[in-house]
Amino acid sequence: MREHADKLDADDPLAGFRDRFALDDPSLVYLNGNSLGALPLATLRRMDSMLRQEWGTALARSWDHWVDLPGRAGDVIGELTGAAPGQVLVADNTTVNLYKLACAALDARPGRHVIVTDRDNFPSDRYVLEGIAAQRGAELRMLDTDIDEGLDPAEVRAAVDEDTALVSLSHVAYRSGALADMAGITAIVHQAGALMLWDLCHSVGAVPIDLDGCDVDLAVGCTYKYVNAGPGAPAFLYVCARLREVLRQPI
């Protein structure tokens, strides 16, 4: 068994990536990226350059370089999430971005008053949606998702109707790791005339994502987990091109 494992390690085309991270203990097998990604060595160099040159030496002149970083960094995230340039913006944190997009989605569907999510969604996502529902006088419908099996498209179909404005779900379940059918569920939501908002916090950087290919409307995600951007790193949001001139910033 050990020989087989050693051979798999030796043949792994990604094995060399370990040397790109500040992992001092060679015996450490770090599998907690869902909580906090490891520190890339390149980040140490970039942070030193940013602090010494961009801030320390260039001072206010660096604003000219920094001002469009949210969009440029967003396009890099777009490469991970299957989003064409100009649709992803790095900003704020996941909770704030979820609040902004959910409110904008409700405003974009006047006459509809239902938000759909599931009871196994990440707690802070549920708290935001509960708060918005209370503020707006909307109805929040909770799917009773099987924790181990994950989201069932048939349950989503049964929960949405002509009153549904928004469906907000996690692409990967934070407790079980269950992967949702992004394309199938998004299509069901669109058939009901509602908007689809995906939380990518536990999938970005870990599994393939194709936001444009799945016809997703909106998405949010963080960068400190599998993207390895570090504690306190800003989150990101995605707004599909067809909605950019439709949605309005609520704050």
Where do the protein language model's features map onto the residues?
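Pyridoxal 5′-phosphate
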Residues: 1-251
